[in-house]
Amino acid sequence: IDFLGEYTTERTQADTTRDTYLRLLAQLSDAGLSQAGRAEVSIKLSAIGLFLPQAGHEIALANARAVCEAAAAAGTTVTLDMEDHTTTDATLEVLRELRADFPWVGAVVQSYLHRTEADCRDLAGAGSRVRLCKGAYKEPASVAYQDGDEVDLSYVRCLKVLMAGEGYPMVASHDPRLLEIARALAHEHGRTPD
């Protein structure tokens, strides 16, 4: 579940978004929907303070940590959404910091970015949860593939890295060709379709 919103510019809004996630996780737990992977939450760091002018990184990290604590108490997980390319390094840094206490925190990576195959290699370790998507933001050619076929080829390269790794790859696509390739790679690497 993803509470939509991004690029918060006020601390009160960042904290309100955090509190919305905390209430959501409590409600999911009360309804019995958070256990055994039935529901998880995804969060955009810019929605919880990443770009605030004063201490944005620290505020986003503290807010994400509070959401992770609530998710752990509810028996579910959190995935950090990826936003435009300007947030990638900061998102991966927060991910590293959160995983010190919450090793199950996942991350989204976007195949249309030139850097993503290398990011997949870095994230494919044991216990790592990685959701691969194509990407939805308008990005310049200097950082992202512009041709749909190039994006798809990158998606497949990233899938190969993630499926061969020791982590938990999550496939985010509506494309029947990519889903079939994902099934074949999962089978090749002895993965089950959970």
Model feature map: region roles:
Residues D2-D194:
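Positively charged, amphipathic and often flexible ligand-engagement surfaces
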